[in-house]
Amino acid sequence: MARGNAPRDSYHLVGISFFILGLGTLLPWNFFITAIPYFQGRLAGTNSSAETMGTNHTSPTDTFNFNNWVTLLSQLPLLLFTLLNSFLYQCIPESVRILGSLLAILLLFALTAALVKVDLSPGLFFSVTMASVWFINSFCAVLQGSLFGQLGTMPSTYSTLFLSGQGLAGIFAALAMLMSLASGVDAQTSALGYFITPCVGILLSIVCYLSLPHLKFARYYLTEKLSQAPTQELETKAELLQADEKNGVPISPQQASPTLDLDPEKEPEPEEPQKPGKPSVFVVFRKIWLTALCLVLVFTVTLSVFPAITAMVTTSSNSPGKWGLFFNPICCFLLFNVMDWLGRSLTSYFLWPDEDSQQLLPLLVCLRFLFVPLFMLCHVPQHARLPIIFRQDAYFITFMLLFAVSNGYLVSLTMCLAPRQVLPHEREVAGALMTFFLALGLSCGASLSFLFKALL
């Protein structure tokens, strides 16, 4: 089936569905972070949020170092299960992986919500919470890898929509934090609301996924691509043909993607035997390794300081009043998530640098390492070793704006470029591999956050 015969995405329903699925994949992580005041209250042995809502989340009274541990234990299972998902995704049916993960996340969040009404000692509550974080993020890893694999077979616009949905999850979490601060409700009420909200979001994600087989546009890319006629012409872009010959992995007509333009005048290479089979993970890795490395470095920088360091920054105002209470939720969490979402959305309009700029992309990614010392030298009252150089609030706000936009844009850019660097039948593997490297970057950043916090 030629690309010109592809059906339209009526009412943008497929795009909306992937946007909501992207939202659902990051709701668990963001709502655990949003509920930090509740967790701090429980770990301090109190059910009242009156005192913990306005405190610094990483102050010396945080004996459990909750912020760092919840970040690390969210990313380690993501790394482990994404690795398994990258190599074993062909062994388990796609629908089982996606739907099963969504149902498991929903069940675990329901159990987490139930714990709000259960009295536990701080140590036991911390252990149960960390176990819940581990298992929820394990299923999130399988879910993300499977969905990115699907997106690898579709136009890059849908990858951008999915990533934008993930960015919106953080905005919801930040707004929930602000409403909780402004409402003055007790910790149990706010925590119950936190954990019911992602349950509703996961239910909506399940509905969206179940609706995809009933949408003609989704069937064309996700189902009918597997049953193309054997006489279908091969993709004939010169660079793809050269890459095919270089790696010795001939593409079969059954594996040709309907998303790319076909040249009716080009004949298949007669000397190349068409061998059915699944694409090699290592062949795909050789094609996308530089883009994957850039993705790792982007998230390493981001998670090494956010939120472990950035959440410690406070206003330098001599009489902060309410601004002191809302400074970090607005200037750290809300600003980051809004600008990160904006950065992810920019790739809907342009992709720069593109796949032909092999040196420029790594340079831009490496420049982000400058944000680590910049944030560490901001107004952090708990400084013991480093001086405070960037004392004014405007410095922190400017750094956060650039930090967040660059994170969102470079993440979305690398995820969109990777499928373009491989053959059509290798795109699903490329999507799964990029998800693994995404998790690797998150884990590296979460681990480094302990070191950078100790250096303060």
Curated annotation (Swiss-Prot):
The chain crosses the membrane at residues 13-33, 69-89, 98-118, 123-143, 161-181, 192-212, 288-308, 323-343, 360-380, 396-416, 432-452. Bidirectional uniporter involved in the facilitative transport of nucleosides and nucleobases, and contributes to maintaining their cellular homeostasis. Functions as a Na(+)-independent, passive transporter. Involved in the transport of nucleosides such as inosine, adenosine, uridine, thymidine, cytidine and guanosine. Also able to transport purine nucleobases (hypoxanthine, adenine, guanine) and pyrimidine nucleobases (thymine, uracil). Involved in nucleoside transport at basolateral membrane of kidney cells, allowing liver absorption of nucleoside metabolites. GO terms for cellular component: apical plasma membrane; basolateral plasma membrane; nuclear membrane; plasma membrane. InterPro entries: ENT1/ENT2, Eqnu_transpt, MFS_trans_sf. Disulfide bonds: none annotated. It is found in: Apical cell membrane; Basolateral cell membrane; Nucleus membrane. It catalyses: inosine(in) = inosine(out); adenosine(in) = adenosine(out); uridine(out) = uridine(in); thymidine(in) = thymidine(out). Transport activity is insensitive to nanomolar concentrations of the inhibitor nitrobenzylmercaptopurine riboside (NBMPR). The gene is Slc29a2. Keywords: Cell membrane, Glycoprotein, Membrane, Nucleus, Phosphoprotein, Transmembrane, Transmembrane helix, Transport. Belongs to the SLC29A/ENT transporter (TC 2.A.57) family. The modification Phosphoserine is found at residue 252. The keyword Acyltransferase does not apply. It is a multi-pass membrane protein. This is Equilibrative nucleoside transporter 2. Pfam families: Nucleoside_tran. Glycans are attached at residue 56. The lineage of its organism: Eukaryota, Metazoa, Chordata, Craniata, Vertebrata.
